[in-house]
């Protein structure tokens, strides 16, 4: 059995869509919950924090070479999600009278759902309308709405519904009419929408009453991350690499089944497997699962970030002794409490929170549109974006607009929820 066949078998069951009400975030280990609660209280009492600066500084420490990262990190998974969408769309019935004939899938940063919807639509021959420009949304999008009346028997795919409205007094009319048109024509439709926009549009337009049912990717807990990251790291395991925690020397990642003994996919050298016992791993990936909210795109961003920590000086002597049996190089991972992820400046940061909330509601925006929809000056927006990029929670999108980064999403989510913003499901 070759490695590609093994990997295909192991992927089965990873990418499952569940009803939104069935989505459950992985539980945070008890000790971590207490630790984070105390740290959050301390940051609020101090009124300032330098963790963001520390996180940015640690980004440039011991970066793994790109050729090794390709053997360690998961690749695109939108094809697996597209297959799940095809399975689902054949089983979901109409949402009922007065509802859109279709269903919605909620998205999160880096989860590949938008790409999966596009891929499925291309294979099925469904049209995918391009996002409207801000000026078209504000003007009502008449030409687009008229086009929906053509070929109504052909299903429609909308990967990013949040790109069809603006939080502006003239920015909701188009989306209202779009939903009305879909209901009246009965045109089959598959919609993707980020979870923050969905919560906002459900409150402001009642979209959850006309576009249902709603699905989400089943949360990735620690064991599911073990499977996913383990299968992705087949190349690294075959090259003799091991993943160990820098304080104890215990494994963080166990070899995927396809490179275990007798599989025909290579040899396993992990201690314990040779004795027929399960490989003992730390709870590092349980922490990643909980902190990422079970979102795969966020989890893989954290995993990549954590693999940058490789200072030998930070490796305990007992850990180095444990690694002496490794037949190849050891990739050291810091214990979870010592991983410094991006964070926001502590205290009330109203301009920063307004910018972040706008980005989450719309997926991504450029500075010009931010000035249209926010009660902030252009100078405040530019300065705020510079601060957020420096913190590592905002990044430039391929089209030059701005978006919340997958790595920074948990910190942004925590901050906005803490300030009472209407938050998404994740």
Language model segments and positions:
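Conserved P-loop NTPase "ATPase switch" module shared by AAA+ and STAND
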Residues: 130-174, 192
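Short, amphipathic alpha-helical interaction segments positioned at domain boundaries
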Residues: 408-426
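A short, basic N-terminal segment
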Residues: 1-99, 422-426
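Winged-helix-like regulatory helical subdomains adjacent to P-loop NTPase cores
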Residues: 297, 301-380
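The catalytic "switch" region of P-loop NTPases
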Residues: 175-283, 290-291, 305, 312
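Minor-groove-contacting beta-hairpin "wing" of winged helix-turn-helix DNA-binding domains
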Residues: 400-406
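P-loop NTPase Walker A phosphate-binding motif
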Residues: 85-97, 107-127
């Amino acid at each position: 059995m070759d490695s590609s066949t093994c990997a295909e078998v192991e992927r089965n069951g990873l990418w499952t869509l569940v009803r939104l009400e069935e989505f459950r975030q992985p539980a945070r280990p008890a000790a971590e919950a207490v630790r984070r609660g105390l740290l959050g209280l301390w940051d609020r009492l101090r009124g300032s924090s330098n963790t963001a600066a520390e996180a940015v500084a640690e980004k440039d420490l011991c970066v793994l070479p790109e050729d090794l990262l390709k053997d360690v990190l998961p690749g695109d998974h939108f094809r697996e999600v597209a297959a799940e969408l095809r399975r689902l769309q054949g089983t979901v019935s109409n949402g009922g009278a007065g509802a859109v004939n279709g269903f919605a899938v909620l998205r999160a940063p880096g989860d590949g759902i938008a790409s999966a919807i596009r891929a499925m639509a291309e294979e099925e021959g469904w049209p995918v309308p391009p996002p409207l420009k801000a000026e078209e949304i504000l003007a009502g999008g008449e030409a687009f709405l008229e086009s929906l009346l053509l070929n109504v028997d052909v299903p429609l795919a909308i990967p990013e519904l949040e790109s069809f409205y603006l939080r502006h007094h003239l920015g909701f009319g188009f989306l209202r009419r779009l939903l009305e048109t879909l209901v009246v024509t009965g045109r089959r439709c598959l919609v993707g929408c980020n979870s923050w926009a969905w919560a906002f549009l459900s409150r402001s337009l009642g979209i959850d009453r006309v576009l249902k049912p709603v699905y989400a990717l089943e949360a990735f807990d620690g064991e599911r991350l073990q499977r996913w990251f383990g299968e992705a790291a087949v190349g690294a395991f075959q090259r003799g690499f091991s993943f160990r925690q820098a304080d104890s020397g215990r494994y963080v990642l166990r070899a995927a089944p396809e490179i275990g003994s007798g599989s025909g996919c290579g040899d396993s050298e992990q201690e314990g497997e040779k004795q027929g016992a399960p490989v003992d791993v730390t709870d590092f990936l349980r922490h990643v699962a909980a902190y990422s909210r079970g979102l795969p795109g966020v989890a893989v961003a954290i995993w990549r970030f954590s693999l940058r920590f490789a200072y030998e000086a930070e490796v305990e002597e007992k850990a180095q002794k444990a690694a002496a049996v490794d037949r190849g190089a050891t990739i050291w991972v810091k214990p979870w409490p010592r991983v410094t992820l991006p964070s926001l400046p502590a205290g009330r940061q109203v301009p920063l929170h307004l910018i972040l909330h706008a980005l989450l509601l719309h997926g991504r925006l450029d500075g010009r549109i931010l000035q249209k929809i926010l009660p902030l000056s252009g100078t405040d927006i530019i300065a705020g974006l510079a601060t957020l990029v420096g913190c590592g929670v905002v990044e430039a999108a391929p089209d030059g607009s701005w978006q919340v980064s997958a790595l920074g999403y948990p910190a942004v989510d925590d901050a906005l929820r803490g300030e009472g913003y209407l938050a998404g499901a994740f």
